[in-house]
């Protein structure tokens, strides 16, 4: 089974993305910016006869007064990956315009914990006002921000993960769902990266070597 880890700031839509991938309302969602996931939760999804374990994680960049302080969320990600028998894909989830904090979050998972051994996707949420979600990535100013912060995903998925009060976004939601599931199937690592192959002390060194 392939492990897929979704990470990002609190309130960016990770849990809604999980529900979209799994095709069931398995993860609790919140309309607030503080996030609703306090610890990692795993859910199974089947994509074209392949089974994936999708990990919803606590939101990063919360203050000490937040549901999960940033330092605790960081350590939770480390402990999650350390206990897995392999990691096949990382998904950086972000709502709209990328902020400076994204650089640290990206570096945390991609470099400090996984040592650039795991492919990484970017999924941009909160695009309900776009005529076509893909238009967001076509704008040079958005691509420029990714380059500025040195975010280099294998692919970018611009989506709508909210059906709407009266299912007004149902059509674009369905297209977004198919898009994300396809990106996972195409870009995941066939031979999962095994964190156990790296000494435990090396993990801690990477985690705190900012």
Where are these regions (language model features)?
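Conserved GTPase G-domain substructure that encodes guanine base recognition and part of the catalytic core
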Residues: 1-210
């Amino acid at each position: 089974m392939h492990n897929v880890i979704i990470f990002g700031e609190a309130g960016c839509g990770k849990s809604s993305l999980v529900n979209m991938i799994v095709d069931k309302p398995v993860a609790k969602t919140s309309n607030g910016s503080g996030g609703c996931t306090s610890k990692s939760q795993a859910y199974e999804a089947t994509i074209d006869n392949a089974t994936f374990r999708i990990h919803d994680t606590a939101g990063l960049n919360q203050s000490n007064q937040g549901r999960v302080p940033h330092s605790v969320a960081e350590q939770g990600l480390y402990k999650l990956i350390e206990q897995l028998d392999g990691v096949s894909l990382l998904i950086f989830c972000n709502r709209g315009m990328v902020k400076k904090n994204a650089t640290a979050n990206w570096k945390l998972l991609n470099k400090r914990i996984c040592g650039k051994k795991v492919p990484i996707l970017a999924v941009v949420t909160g695009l309900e006002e776009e005529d076509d979600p893909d238009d967001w990535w076509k704008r040079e100013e958005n691509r420029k921000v990714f380059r500025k912060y040195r975010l280099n995903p294998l692919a970018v998925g611009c989506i709508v993960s909210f059906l709407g009060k009266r299912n007004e976004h149902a059509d674009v939601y369905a297209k977004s769902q198919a898009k994300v599931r396809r990106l996972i199937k195409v870009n995941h690592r066939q031979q999962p990266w095994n964190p156990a192959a790296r000494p435990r002390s090396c993990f801690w060194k990477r985690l705190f070597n900012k």
